[in-house]
Amino acid sequence: MKYIGAHVSAAGGLANAPARAAEIGATAFALFTKNQRQWRAAPLTPQVIDDFKIACEKYHFSAAQILPHDSYLINLGHPVSEALEKSRDAFLDEMQRCEQLGLTLLNFHPGSHLMQIAQEDCLARIAESINIALAQTEGVTAVIENTAGQGSNLGFEFEQLAAIIDGVEDKSRVGVCIDTCHAFAAGYDLRTPEACEKTFAEFGKIVGFQYLRGMHLNDAKSAFGSRVDRHHSLGEGNIGHDAFRWIMQDGRFDGIPLILETINPDIWAEEIAWLKAQQIAEAMA
């Protein structure tokens, strides 16, 4: 079964996120558990936690259908020790918030070397940062998102994701989230079913589908291989509809959150309905 949704706002309280997801016909959703552009956040109160759990139950969202995202400020591969520690503390807080909310996944961008340390050293720092957080939490999987490779961001090659996973001690609590726009911008073609087959065969060989814990379904304004991260609405960008139809009709993408981060929230309900219809079309074929 496909879990399909979008990254919804938690404005006004975390308990509003499940309701907003339900309003657009979603069977999955992503959210920030705190302001993503600030380092610090007030601790979660028992009331906030209870309200969120009650809302998830009311709208029939299990933890497997929810893919929270951490703060954009965090850089788990930071070359400077003080800044690295600040990021590690913030990441641990994000993991602990998920733990408190009964969530089992935390999606994050791996990190950047900022042109100051070798790529291999940065990847090792990211893996160690994950190890530190996993050692102090239970039940939450660290889900590494592939990047477009913009600037000095790592995680744009499947080999880089595999290297991070290789350095994580508890393999049962690490996974990846593949963003289609990022993959396309990083040079992984998705424009035809044949291209999708090739790209995901490579993913399966290098990373492994056992580590796929979520996806971000985004078309791309950016050009193929441009290393530029610019999302677009489904079918309106340089990837086109075929990739998303192909994903909907492939069982390897069942049972994980498939999250829209497309640029027009006003049509998320339409995009979700279209994605759902692609499954039905396959079932009837």
Curated annotation (Swiss-Prot):
Pfam families: AP_endonuc_2. GO terms for molecular function: deoxyribonuclease IV (phage-T4-induced) activity; DNA binding; DNA-(apurinic or apyrimidinic site) endonuclease activity; phosphoric diester hydrolase activity; zinc ion binding. Its EC number is 3.1.21.2. Binds 3 Zn(2+) ions. Zn(2+) 2 binds at E145, D179, H216, E261. It is an enzyme of class 3 (hydrolase). GO terms for biological process: base-excision repair. Zn(2+) 3 binds at H182, D229, H231. Zn(2+) 1 binds at H69, H109, E145. Its cofactor is Zn(2+). It catalyses: Endonucleolytic cleavage to 5'-phosphooligonucleotide end-products. It comes from the Bacteria. Belongs to the AP endonuclease 2 family. NCBIfam families: nfo (TIGR00587), PRK01060.1-4 (NF002199). Endonuclease IV plays a role in DNA repair. It cleaves phosphodiester bonds at apurinic or apyrimidinic (AP) sites, generating a 3'-hydroxyl group and a 5'-terminal sugar phosphate. This is Probable endonuclease 4.
